[in-house]
Amino acid sequence: MFRGKIFVLSLFSIYVLSSAAEKNTSFSALFAFGDSVLDTGNNNFLLTLLKGNYWPYGLSFDYKFPTGRFGNGRVFTDIVAEGLQIKRLVPAYSKIRRISSEDLKTGVCFASGGSGIDDLTSRTLRVLSAGDQVKDFKDYLKKLRRVVKRKKKVKEIVSNAVFLISEGNNDLGYFVAPALLRLQSTTTYTSKMVVWTRKFLKDLYDLGARKFAVMGVMPVGCLPIHRASFGGVFGWCNFLLNRITEDFNMKLQKGLTSYAVEYDFKDAKFVYVDIYGTLMDLVKNPMAYGFTEAKKACCCMPNAIIPCFHPDKYVFYDFAHPSQKAYEVISKPIVYQIAKGLA
């Protein structure tokens, strides 16, 4: 059933994007916040073990060069930005990097691989927390003002930009780890995650953000790393972890619906991005989309130290990240959803 939904929405997205003007007129820029699903290289400049700037990452990227993206090529940030007719690549925003004026005006990425909406997750992995990313966005605004020179123009760019957010994947992954169990139930924790997400969105709103595309959590129980640790020789998904994920996603979706009518978020628009359902459809029906492997990773696992020859045939490139091809497939209905919901 979901497969048909992806197919129909893909046709709609092709029509919408092809019938639009050659240059995007709906969105001024795209800003990405969150974790490794969106990180385009910010962790390169951090003292953390979570990096994607070495072989075999980037094998399908331009010049086959690792950039810090956690995958074989472009990541979800890049693919959504291109689908929305903004630009093909979204650079990582690091305060020690020089970014062109054009990139400053059309969007950058603040996401950090390993980040969580729970500060403890980010501190444990020594990556940028949600609060750190907000601080970086404030710093970015100063640079944008120097480039644009007009406050009104800065406000227009930010208010008409898509704020793409992916948080929660690492929080839920580490919540079930015995060493990091909190003294609370999973339902209590997922409710707290929604509260933290609201604060994060409000911080961005107060800085001018108005168009939010907020991603749910992936089916983390079906990631290769959890299949290997939970599923044994059969490679089963961790159904418990998926249930916790579904609980959070349901609460997040309800929260976004309520935020849209709150005075605190006046004039803001929210789209819930169902990456759980779209990615799960690929996991359950890989051959329908041209994939031959949905359980194992192409690389970076004990049973796949050397990368596979055809990453486009794998749903997952490494232990926890979809391949570029998988991102391209699931992005089609999502781009249509964002374009329609935030226009």
From Swiss-Prot:
Biological process (GO), any one: lipid catabolic process
Compartment(s): Secreted, Extracellular space, Extracellular matrix, Pollen coat
Gene name per UniProt: EXL6
Protein name: GDSL esterase/lipase EXL6
Predominant location category: secreted
Domain of life, source organism: Eukaryota
Family stated for the protein in its record: Belongs to the 'GDSL' lipolytic enzyme family.
Signal peptide (UniProt feature, chain positions): 1-21
